[in-house]
Amino acid sequence: MKEQSFEANLKKLEKIVAQLEDEKTDLDKSAELFEEGSALAAELSAKLKTIKFKVSEIKEKQGDLFTEEINNDDE
């Protein structure tokens, strides 16, 4: 099974939240939605942490380049 994109999972989570906020959603369905939403939220959070780490690594490797660009802008 293909992994869903971050954006697709975010939209799915937004739909779940909307259903949970709907007073017509019964208790059993709410519990099921909450479990699914919690899992999606954890997955999205992990993905964001991974991307943040990758960006930090890139910036660290390219630190001299970024510093040079900033210093050249000051001149």
UniProtKB/Swiss-Prot annotation:
The subcellular localization recorded is: Cytoplasm
Entry's Gene Ontology cellular component terms: cytosol; exodeoxyribonuclease VII complex
Per the UniProt record, which EC number(s) apply here? 3.1.11.6
Keyword flag Hydrolase: yes
User: Its principal location?
Assistant: cytoplasm
Q: Which GO terms describe its molecular function?
A: exodeoxyribonuclease VII activity
Alphabetized UniProt keyword annotations: Cytoplasm, Exonuclease, Hydrolase, Nuclease
Does the record bear Transmembrane helix in its keywords? no
Q: Which reaction is this enzyme known to catalyze?
A: Exonucleolytic cleavage in either 5'- to 3'- or 3'- to 5'-direction to yield nucleoside 5'-phosphates
List GO BP terms, alphabetically: DNA catabolic process
User: InterPro entries recorded for this chain?
Assistant: Exonuc_VII_S, Exonuc_VII_ssu_sf
Function of the protein: Bidirectionally degrades single-stranded DNA into large acid-insoluble oligonucleotides, which are then degraded further into small acid-soluble oligonucleotides.
Assembly and partners are described as: Heterooligomer composed of large and small subunits.
Q: Which NCBIfam families match?
A: xseB (TIGR01280)
- Give the family, as the similarity comment puts it: Belongs to the XseB family.
The record's annotation in PANTHER family points to: EXODEOXYRIBONUCLEASE 7 SMALL SUBUNIT
What is the protein name for this chain? Exodeoxyribonuclease 7 small subunit
The source organism is: Elusimicrobium minutum (strain Pei191)
Give the source lineage, highest ranks first.
Bacteria, Pseudomonadati, Elusimicrobiota, Elusimicrobia, Elusimicrobiales
